[in-house]
């Protein structure tokens, strides 16, 4: 059997849309409660975090909207629900901080990435404030100007 290529940082999936839609203020590392077929699918990077968010309810954190596609070779006697809610494991102090911040207007808790940390699967969640449309355009303009500046620096070095 051929070895699977491992991503150098251990990152399984990223939610780039969350970084585009929110000003990220605080990041937290949370463990995930998963079943066996989900771990196999995550090894094969069959996960999407695009519309995922964190729901804080009854002193617990739940990952909603995360889609983990079951593998064809997964167990047939277990009914796989790709979009089920998954429990996030956080310290009580972190949960209290998230709960108090989310109750403020404009703040949301979103999943940024899922990655390997040694043999465990972790989820990076973030507390963010929603961006307005003009903020998104401003960020895009800054990124474009930085890219142009880098190009100019590179071409100036080649002319010498």
Swiss-Prot record:
Supply the CDD domains for this chain.
Answer: SmpB
Single GO molecular function: RNA binding
Has the keyword Cytoplasm been applied to this entry? Answer: yes
Q: Which GO terms describe its biological process?
A: trans-translation
Q: Which UniProt keywords apply?
A: Cytoplasm, RNA-binding
- Location(s), subcellular: Cytoplasm
The segments labelled Disordered in the record are 131-160
Q: Which GO terms describe its cellular component?
A: cytosol
Q: Where is the signal peptide?
A: none
Among HAMAP family, the record links this protein to: SmpB (MF_00023)
User: What's this protein's function?
Assistant: Required for rescue of stalled ribosomes mediated by trans-translation. Binds to transfer-messenger RNA (tmRNA), required for stable association of tmRNA with ribosomes. tmRNA and SmpB together mimic tRNA shape, replacing the anticodon stem-loop with SmpB. tmRNA is encoded by the ssrA gene; the 2 termini fold to resemble tRNA(Ala) and it encodes a 'tag peptide', a short internal open reading frame. During trans-translation Ala-aminoacylated tmRNA acts like a tRNA, entering the A-site of stalled ribosomes, displacing the stalled mRNA.
**NCBIfam families in UniProt:** PRK05422.1, smpB
Family in the record: Belongs to the SmpB family.
Q: What is this protein called?
A: SsrA-binding protein
Species per Swiss-Prot/TrEMBL record = Pseudomonas syringae pv. tomato (strain ATCC BAA-871 / DC3000)
Q: Which gene encodes it?
A: smpB
């Amino acid at each position: 059997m051929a070895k699977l290529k491992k991503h150098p940082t251990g990152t399984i999936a990223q939610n780039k849309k969350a970084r585009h839609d929110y000003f990220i203020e605080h990041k937290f590392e949370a463990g995930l409660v998963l079943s066996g077929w989900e771990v196999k699918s995550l090894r094969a990077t069959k996960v999407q975090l695009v519309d995922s968010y964190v729901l804080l309810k009854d002193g617990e954190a739940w990952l909603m909207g995360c889609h983990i596609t079951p593998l064809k070779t997964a167990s047939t006697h277990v009914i796989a629900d790709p979009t089920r809610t998954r429990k996030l494991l956080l310290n009580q102090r972190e949960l209290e901080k998230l709960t108090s911040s989310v109750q403020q207007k404009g703040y949301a808790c979103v999943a940024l990435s899922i990655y390997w940390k040694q043999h465990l699967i972790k989820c990076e969640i973030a507390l963010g404030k929603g961006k307005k449309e003009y903020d998104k355009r401003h960020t895009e303009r800054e990124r474009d100007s930085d890219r142009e500046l880098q190009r100019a620096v590179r071409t100036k070095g080649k002319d010498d």
